[in-house]
Design a protein with these regions (language model features):
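A conserved acidic beta->alpha catalytic loop
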Residues: 38-48
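Catalytic metal- and UDP-sugar-binding loop of GT-A-like glycosyltransferases, i.e.
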Residues: 90
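Active-site beta-to-alpha loop of glycosyltransferases that engages the nucleotide-sugar donor
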Residues: 9-22, 40-41
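Cell-envelope/extracellular polymer assembly enzymes that use nucleotide-activated donors
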Residues: 3-6, 33
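Short, acidic, metal-binding catalytic loop of nucleotide-sugar glycosyltransferases
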Residues: 23-32
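Short aromatic/hydrophobic "clamp" motif used to bind/position activated sugar donors
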Residues: 87
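Glycine-rich, basic loop-to-helix element that forms the pyrophosphate-binding segment
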Residues: 66-82
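Conserved short acidic donor-positioning loop in nucleotide-sugar-dependent glycosyltransferases
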Residues: 25, 39-41, 69
Length: 90
């Protein structure tokens, strides 16, 4: 079944507010796909949080880790991996 919407969340050292963002997006349920794009975070727990949620919600969340390429590359990585009918960057 195709997801209705893909939410892409480009992240860079974003641990302080990631959980709130992800928990809010999870309210969309199985109709949504959430792609967490870790853009080379090194100063906090961003990569671990991405992996934690991807393991906990494997049918909804995908974690992608890449070298730092900036916000635009995070958005593009989300587009390349999106399967939803609609696409939204958060």
């Amino acid at each position: 079944m195709q997801k209705l919407i893909t939410f892409a969340v480009p992240c860079y050292n974003s641990a302080a507010y990631m959980r709130h963002c992800i928990e809010t997006l999870l309210s969309a349920g199985e109709q949504a796909e959430i792609i967490l794009v870790d853009d080379g975070s090194v100063k906090d727990e961003t990569p671990a949080i991405c992996d934690e949620y991807a393991a906990q919600y494997p049918t909804i969340i995908k974690a992608i880790h890449q070298e730092n390429g900036g916000h635009g590359e995070g958005v593009n990585q989300g587009i390349r991996n999106a399967t939803g009918l609609y696409y939204k960057v958060v």
